Every structure is written in C-alpha cells, then in structure tokens.
C-alpha cells in the first residue's frame, strides 16, 4: 500500500506516530510561510502542515485537488486551534516528505466549499460526476447504498435465499412501459429487449424449484421522462414458493428493519396496513404520507340536497387547515392558482371565524342547515379553514390528497427524522385502460380493462371464480409498502395456474394467439407443476435516497441520467456510424413475397 493510515481515522492516540497518507488537496492556507492543507481521502480529512523549508517551498505550488502522498509525524494541534467539527480535529501531521502523485487542472467548481454546492448546476455536476463524487455528501451516498445492499443480503442469506442473475438481453414482452430495444446482429431484423423487470424469469425460477430467489436487479423502461425518474434503475427483487401474502410481508419487514438500522432508526413491526379503498377515501392517494394527521372527510351525502350547484356533483370532499382562517386574501387566491396548476377549476373554501361564524364564497351559497352543520361534520374548529373539492371522485380525491400535503408543509407538520410506514393492500385487480393511459402508463391488452399491477398478479382467493365476470369489482392479491408518501416496494401472489392466467389475458383483450406469441414460454412452464408463489420488489434507488435524506434519486446513483434522459458525462445517447448501422442490421428490411407479404 502507498499509505499506512487513512486521513480521517487519525486520532490523539496516534500522536508521535510516523504516518504516510495519500489523498487530494482540499482547503489550502498559507500563514507566514507555514502551509496548512486539508488532505482528503475516502475516510475524511486530516490537516497536514508544511513547516520544514524544503517541503514548505514545494508545497507553495500545490493547488486544489492535486493528488498527494505525504509522510510525517502526528502531533497535537496547538491549544485553541483544534477543530471540533472534524473527527481528526485534535491532531495534525507535520510533513517531512511530499510526493505529488498527480496534478489537477482548473476546477469547474469547488469541491470542498459547502457555500458553492447549491450554485453548481446539475448538468455541470453530472458532466464532472467524478469530481462531484469527491464531495463528502455525494461519496457518502454511494457508501450508504453499499451498506444497505449488504444489510439486505444478510437478511436474505439468513432465510436461505439464493442470489441469481437473470438475463439482461431478452425478448420484448408487454409489461406496462416501452422497451429499450437492441438489434440482434446475427439475426437481422430481430431485436432483443432490455428487461423492465425480472418478473417472468423469477417466476420461471419458481417453476424450476429454486423456491427462494433474490437479485439486486437492473431494470430498463423507455418511458416519457417524469420528475425524478431514470430510464435505468435498480430494484431488490425477491420471489418465494409455497407462500401466502403474510409470508412475503413478514420477510419484507425484516429487510426494511435491517436497512433502516443503517441510519440508526428502529422500525416498529408489524407495520400498519390499510386497504386501497381507505387510502383513497381518507388520503386521496394510494401512497399516503402518514407523518401528519390530516384526513379527507367525504361530504357527498351531507350536501345531497344542496342548492349550491358546485356541490351538485358525483363527489364532494373536504380537508381542514388548522388555523387557516387568518390567511390573507392573496394566500387564498394563491390556493386557487395552485389547484388550477393541477387541472382543477379551483379550491372552494369556508373560513371558520373565532366566534364560529362562517365566511367565504361557499358559506354564502349553502343553506342555513348546511352552514350550521358543516364545521362539525368535517371536524373544523374556530380559526380553521375548510377546503373543498367537488366533481368526479378520483380527481377530486387526488386534489384533496395533494392539498393535505401542501397544508402539512405550510404548517410545518413534517419534522425532520420522522418516518411513517404503511402497507396498502386489496387494490383493484383491473383498472379502465383509459385511466392507465391518462396517467402515462402503457395499457396492456386491447380491451377496456388493463392490469393495475401486472398481468401475472393473482386475484384474491374470493375473486378467483368470478373476476372475469365483474373485472371492476375484483381485488388483487397484492401489497405495496409506503414510506413518507413514497411507494418503496410492491408485490403480489402470482398466478400459477394456466387457466387463470388465460382468463386474465382474456379480460385484458390479449388473444390466445398473442398470449402464446408473447408469453408462450411462461404458459408452457405452468403446465409442469408450477408451485404457488409470490414476491416483492423494492425500489432501491428511492429507498437509499430516503435513507440519505436526498431530494432526488440521482444523488444515490453513481452515474445517473439528467432529467431529459441524457448522460452529460458521456453525452449518451449518441449517434452511431454508418458501418455500425449496417453491421447491426438496424436498417434491415425483410424481403416481400409474391403477394407483397413479408417472407419469414
């Protein structure tokens, strides 16, 4: 090794030791010919001092991010110059030998200056990601990710799981998003697809008798770029045979407990559960943030005989903003703009005065009986503001769900370090295909119905006999885990019987011929004694970003794409040469037969 110690691990116990350190020049200070440098390596920082004339003279030429090797004796810092913010802040190294391992060009941004970290644009940070990762916060994010990987692997090893890699080059199968396609040079005109998930292969592994599988899997989805999405991402993928929902949830909770321990937090188990129906009814979201106690109150029946036309609708609901009655008019107007940005016409409101009197546009338009009872109905007290949404049920609840989050932020109800987990169970098995398309997903199949999760999710046992007769009523044998309003994992008990799988395909409008073409290998496998099985996949990037307190998953990915799906570092995606196009067969056109049909 080129060094004897790590810079950040030196302590007063090392005083008197001769050490050799390696690292990069951070802050540099020149005090009357004595040069002080913060030398940084992966462990942290140590102050090294150049006092001797020869090395001090050479140290004058050192600049930020020069890569150095220094040898010297560990000494106590002079009294009063200790740095309590550094683990090594009680010592310094008096350098006797200096070797410049490599010089550094002028920096595009400062590495060690926290005051400039927010001023550097993300495109610049990603273009020079290898410099960005020298920053402690960014480097620590990847080290945290590594520890989380190890913690999860430890739990799975204790339960006798086998880590298995599934193919990255496979065939295109409809799974809810667009595939990334790779031309097959040896079979011109044909393409591999990068997997959107290991779903089909892990089910095949259950048929193969592996029983307990996991993988930290790379997944790829060619979807429109939304906020904080990546075209390639990572999930912890787990599958088990001969299990029910309780078995999978129990294991998943063990994994979550282990990885949250990495940041010193103890998750209380069993984690609470709520049904999908309750999540939508009370929180307006299938991933409710439970760090604050604000719920939606349905008012549809309360206003069933109203004369107020706005509330003569399919659904009326409300959320209460405690102390919100004293908001100035400009703030109430800002709420209207906020709602319009989310596709609503506005956000109706009632202000409850300190004397209990109601005011605001809604209060003037409802009946005396409605005015007398609305505050009690929604749980509003004097000084509160009641916000309403009316219209179609789903978008109205979604608006109120977003409003409860906005209220929590404005009132400071979310405290740093708070964690709230819940399982959301009993989601619908199918949803209208139009709803899936409207939300930006790809609706599988060709009927009015598509799968909410994926086409291989089993109906709950009580719906097995009639799910295809009433698709809108059937519930999925599925479970999602939510943390602080983020879905961090989801899974289900899978279909393992060929006839059930074929019935699901039929509901979705996937013909028998299409099913054989796309999923024939899976259907064939089911014919050979496929066991009951189920599993879960955790969104690994999201989990690590939550653990590290990052706003974006890009901060916990070594070399992420920008918001537009571009890699500023390598400038990918890029064009390919004419020779590459020809060699890959990407422009291959099948010959046509006598009747103009493509030859096979």
From Swiss-Prot:
Top-level EC class as recorded in UniProt: ligase
Catalysed transformations (reactions): tRNA(Asx) + L-aspartate + ATP = L-aspartyl-tRNA(Asx) + AMP + diphosphate
EC number: 6.1.1.23
Keyword field: Aminoacyl-tRNA synthetase, ATP-binding, Cytoplasm, Ligase, Nucleotide-binding, Protein biosynthesis
Keyword Transmembrane: no
Sites where the protein binds ATP: 221-223, 230, 487, 539-542
GO biological process per UniProt: aspartyl-tRNA aminoacylation
Intracellular or extracellular location(s): Cytoplasm
Region (Aspartate): 199-202
Gene3D superfamilies in the cross-refs: Bira Bifunctional Protein, Domain 2, GAD-like domain, Nucleic acid-binding proteins
Site (Important for tRNA non-discrimination): 31, 80
Domain of life: Bacteria
Quaternary context: Homodimer.
HAMAP family reported for this sequence: Asp_tRNA_synth_type1
Family: Belongs to the class-II aminoacyl-tRNA synthetase family. Type 1 subfamily.
Entry protein name: Aspartate--tRNA(Asp/Asn) ligase
The gene coding this protein: aspS
């Amino acid at each position: 090794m080129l060094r004897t110690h790590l810079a950040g691990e030196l302590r007063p116990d090392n005083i008197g030791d001769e050490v050799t350190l390696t690292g990069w020049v951070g802050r540099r200070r020149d005090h009357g010919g004595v040069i002080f440098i913060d030398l940084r390596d992966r462990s942290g920082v140590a102050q090294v001092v150049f006092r001797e004339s020869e090395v001090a003279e050479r140290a004058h030429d050192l600049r930020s991010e020069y890569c150095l090797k220094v040898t010297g004796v560990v000494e106590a810092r002079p009294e009063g110059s200790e740095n309590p913010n550094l683990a090594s802040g009680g010592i310094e190294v008096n350098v006797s030998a200096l070797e410049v391992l490599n010089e550094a060009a002028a920096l595009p941004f400062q590495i060690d200056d926290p005051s400039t970290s927010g001023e550097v644009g993300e495109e610049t940070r990603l273009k020079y990601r290898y410099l960005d990762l020298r920053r402690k916060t960014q480097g620590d994010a990847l080290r945290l990710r590594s520890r989380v990987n190890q913690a999860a692997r430890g739990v799975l090893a204790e339960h006798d799981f086998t880590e298995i890699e599934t193919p990255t080059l496979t065939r295109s199968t409809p799974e809810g998003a667009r595939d990334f396609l790779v031309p097959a040079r040896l079979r011109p005109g044909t393409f591999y697809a990068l997997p959107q998930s290991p779903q089909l292969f892990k089910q095949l592994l259950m048929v193969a008798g592996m029983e307990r599988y996991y993988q930290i899997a790379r997944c790829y989805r060619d979807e429109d770029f939304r906020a904080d999405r990546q075209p390639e991402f990572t999930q912890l993928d787990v599958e088990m045979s001969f299990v029910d929902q309780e078995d999978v949830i129990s294991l998943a909770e063990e994994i979550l407990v282990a990885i949250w321990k990495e940041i010193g937090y103890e998750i209380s188990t069993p984690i609470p559960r709520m049904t999908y129906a309750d999540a939508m009814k009370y929180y307006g979201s299938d991933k409710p943030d439970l760090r604050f106690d604000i719920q939606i109150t349905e008012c549809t029946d309360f206003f069933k005989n109203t004369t107020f036309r706005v509330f003569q609708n399919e659904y009326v609901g409300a959320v209460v903003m405690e102390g919100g009655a004293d908001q100035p008019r400009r703030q109430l107007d800002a709420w209207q703009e906020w709602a319009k940005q989310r596709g609503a016409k506005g956000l109706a409101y009632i202000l409850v005065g300190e004397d209990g009197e109601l005011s605001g546009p809604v209060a003037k338009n409802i009946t005396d009986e409605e005015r007398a009872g609305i505050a009690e109905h929604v749980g509003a007290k004097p000084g509160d503001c009641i916000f309403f949404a009316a219209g179609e049920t789903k978008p109205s609840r979604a608006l109120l769900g977003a409003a409860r989050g906005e209220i929590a932020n404005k009132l400071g109800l979310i405290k740093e370090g708070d964690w709230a987990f819940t399982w959301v169970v009993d989601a619908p098995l199918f949803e209208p295909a139009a709803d899936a398309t409207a939300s930006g997903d790809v609706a599988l199949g060709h009927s009015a119905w598509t799968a909410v999760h994926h086409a291989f999710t089993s109906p709950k046992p009580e719906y097995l006999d009639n799910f295809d007769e009433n698709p809108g009523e059937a519930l999925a044998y599925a479970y999602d885990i939510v943390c602080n309003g983020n879905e961090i994992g989801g899974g289900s008990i899978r279909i393992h019987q060929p006839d059930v799988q074929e019935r699901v395909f039929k509901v979705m409008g996937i013909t028998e011929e299409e099913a054989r073409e796309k999923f024939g290998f899976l259907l064939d496998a089911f014919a050979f004694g496929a066991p009951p099985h189920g599993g879960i996949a955790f969104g690994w990037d999201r989990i690590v970003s939550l653990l590290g307190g990052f706003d974006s998953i890009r901060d916990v990915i070594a070399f992420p794409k920008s918001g537009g799906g571009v890699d500023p570092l390598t400038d990918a995606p890029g064009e390919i040469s004419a020779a590459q196009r020809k060699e890959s067969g990407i422009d291959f056109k099948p010959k046509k037969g006598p009747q103009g049909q493509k030859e096979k």
